[in-house]
Design a protein with these regions (language model features):
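Membrane-embedded alpha-helical bundles of multi-pass transporters/translocases
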Residues: 1-324
């Protein structure tokens, strides 16, 4: 109220503006419709998948391919995705939106490369660790009957292979939202869901005890196809992303992870077997195997000169040296 007189004397005249044009509500409404439609498609695929698992369980009650088994496998799968990929991409999203607002393709390219590289430093090793530690790991976390272990462990392993494609799918969503391109997000979701449903149909071709593995494979392959399709589209939109550098980093990380996974598998499963089914054996195999995998991976990262891993590791080592 105190500012009314000074503003009037300064020449300010308030004129009410009627209507809702010019506020960006139209663009917001359009992207909301596209996004909601994509969400409906994704949820539809989830409902179909769970209906199919329920049918298998109903017809073959002796198998362990239940919805609860899928939920348990997905819970383990989502841990690294939630802590690593989602955290990094959430931090990148405001900068991606700013790059789009500024019309800077070069900034967007740089941010996309960061989104493809930074999570991969931990996600690719986590993928291989999930594969080799799946069996003792699920027995450590869940109370399972002997007949339930194999199916759940295989599902976790297959899902683990798809950690990177799932992360790329998350980056694709952030990219589309930053560009206010809900239509592209819907198209990518339709592609992913279509591939997933096609693979899910094969559930009735394989023996019923493999139903859960088929669901895991459908998720992994669908996300892989969707990730590749989006990378092609984004590369065309931005005039290239620089995937050569990204692929070289992924290859080095995969080599280091695979080499570290072999002795880890032998040690972890050896300790697990020595426990004769006791929880201590499962937990010991998982814990010691996990520590061994991390140690071997870091040594191999140094040998292969994976600079990005060393850049993350060196500050932590310096802090530890100072404290000691």
């Amino acid at each position: 109220m105190f500012l009314i007189i000074p503003l009037h004397r300064g020449g300010f005249r308030w004129r009410p503006r009627w209507g809702i044009r010019g506020y960006g509500l139209g663009a917001a409404a359009r992207i909301t419709v596209w996004t909601f439609t994509a969400l409906v498609i994704a949820q539809f695929a989830g409902i179909i998948m769970k209906k199919m698992l329920s049918h298998v369980r109903l017809v073959h009650p002796e198998v362990s391919s239940s919805i609860s088994a899928y939920d348990n496998a997905f819970l383990i799968f989502m841990l690294p995705q939630s802590f690593i990929t989602t955290s990094i991409l959430t931090a990148l999203f405001p900068r991606m939106s700013r790059a789009n607002a500024d019309g800077s393709n070069s900034a967007m390219k740089k941010l996309l490369r960061q989104g493809l590289e930074m999570p991969a430093l931990a996600i690719i090793p986590c993928s291989l660790a999930m594969v080799v530690l799946a069996r003792p790991g699920v027995q450590t976390v869940f109370s399972l009957e002997p007949g339930q272990v194999g199916s759940l462990a295989r599902a976790v392993a297959v899902m683990g292979v798809g950690l990177l494609p799932f992360g790329i799918a998350t980056l694709q969503q952030r990219y589309c939202f930053a560009r206010e391109d809900g239509k592209l997000n819907l198209i990518m979701q339709a592609v992913t869901t279509g591939v997933q449903l096609i693979i899910l149909v094969t559930m009735f071709v394989f023996p019923p005890q493999h139903a859960l593995v088929v669901v895991a494979a459908a998720q992994t392959i669908a996300n892989l196809v969707g990730a590749v399709a989006w990378l092609v589209v984004a590369s065309r939109q931005l005039g290239g992303i620089g995937m050569g550098e990204v692929n070289r980093l992924w290859t080095k990380l995969a080599v280091a992870s695979i080499v570290a996974a072999v002795p880890t598998y032998l040690v972890a499963h050896g300790i697990d077997a020595a426990g004769h089914g006791a929880w201590v054996g499962h937990a010991g195999g998982t814990l010691i195997g996990g520590v061994l995998f991390v140690a071997l991976f870091l040594v191999l990262a140094k040998i292969l000169r994976i600079v990005e891993v060393l850049d993350l590791l060196n500050p932590m080592l310096r802090k530890m040296m100072r404290r000691s």
